[in-house]
From Swiss-Prot:
Alphabetical UniProt keywords: Oxidoreductase, tRNA processing
Alphabetized PROSITE patterns for the sequence: RHODANESE_3
Keyword Transport in record: no
Enzyme class: oxidoreductase
Domain of life of the native organism: Bacteria
Protein name: tRNA uridine(34) hydroxylase
Classification lineage: Bacteria, Pseudomonadati, Pseudomonadota, Alphaproteobacteria, Rickettsiales
A Pfam cross-reference name: UPF0176_N
Record-annotated active site: C182 (cysteine persulfide intermediate)
GO molecular function, one term: oxidoreductase activity, acting on paired donors, with incorporation or reduction of molecular oxygen
């Protein structure tokens, strides 16, 4: 059976020539038969790429030849099918779009304190800690950590508005201990930096995100409930990082990532049933 290695990575660093990097990076990926998506912006690089193991190693070596990216770290998982349809390298304003102008240079922004996966469950179980899931509704409906607050955002850009309303509604103190998590860690870099920027003093983030938590702990403490949405053709994985099959609640056909992202309120519906639900609601 054919086996594919999937790597996810991000690195915040000023890439003044990021537009010039695109063609060379895309050519490298195509030459090595890789598929996935890489985002390039002035603030850094963010990507998920899959292929045969040797070619993935060559790709990572190629990326890290750039001295600005030598500190690039990545997470690996494995699958018996290619989880991407094509190879794309895109130029963006941000590698993860929070839309906060004050965070344009992440290299000089103060982010949340990293918490190792092995220490995460004990942190979020504390009564003096508020845990926030920074992902979107279509993701959180599939699974999340116990004790966590679900902002029910449709888009990551909505997160700032939710925070402002949450502070006002619950009269949240800037001394409140805040623990935050996302799928792979990159959204927490931005969201924890935002929380620090507006005045929160005790902000923590799960190092490497949910995927790293699965890799390192296998959820042995049972802090995670459900499955984890991923942005590729696996759609969702369990705590062993094995793909699961999600079926439409109405017609039982297998749903894909676009179905889930486009259905309101995070229900597991195919696009056809989702359109009918929207039309008659």
């Amino acid at each position: 059976m054919e086996k594919f290695t999937l790597v996810t990575f991000y690195h915040f660093v000023q890439l003044e020539n990021y537009e010039d990097m695109r063609d060379e990076l895309l050519s490298c990926c195509i030459e090595k038969g890789l598929k996935g998506t890489v985002l390039l912006a002035l603030e850094g690089i963010n990507g998920s790429v899959a292929g045969h193991d040797g070619e993935i190693r060559d790709f990572l070596d190629f990326v890290r030849r750039d001295e600005r990216l030598r500190g690039l770290e990545w997470k690996e998982s494995y699958t018996n099918f290619q989880p991407f349809q094509e190879m794309k390298v895109r130029l963006k304003k941000e590698i993860v779009a929070l839309g906060c102008a004050e965070l344009e240079n992440m290299e000089i922004c103060e982010t949340g304190e990293y918490v190792e996966p092995e220490d995460w469950s004990s942190l979020i179980a504390r009564e003096d800690v508020k845990t926030i899931d920074t992902r979107n509704l279509y993701e959180t409906k599939l699974g999340r950590f116990k004790y966590s607050i679900d902002p029910e955002t449709i888009n990551f850009r909505d997160f700032q508005e939710w925070v402002r309303k949450w502070i006002e509604k619950d009269n949240v103190s800037m001394e409140q201990k805040i623990a935050m998590y996302c799928t792979g860690g990159v959204r927490c870099e931005k969201s924890t930096a935002y929380m620090k920027r507006i005045g929160f003093k005790n902000v923590y983030q799960l190092k490497g995100g949910i995927i790293n938590y699965f890799l390192k702990t296998k959820n042995k403490d049972g802090a995670w409930v459900g499955d984890c949405f991923v942005f590729d053709d696996r759609v969702a994985v369990n705590v062993d990082l094995e793909p699961i099959q999600l079926k439409c609640l109405e017609c039982s056909c297998v749903v894909n990532t676009d179905d889930l992202k486009n259905i309101p309120r995070g229900r597991v519906l195919c696009s056809g049933c989702g359109q009918n639900t929207t039309r008659f609601s």
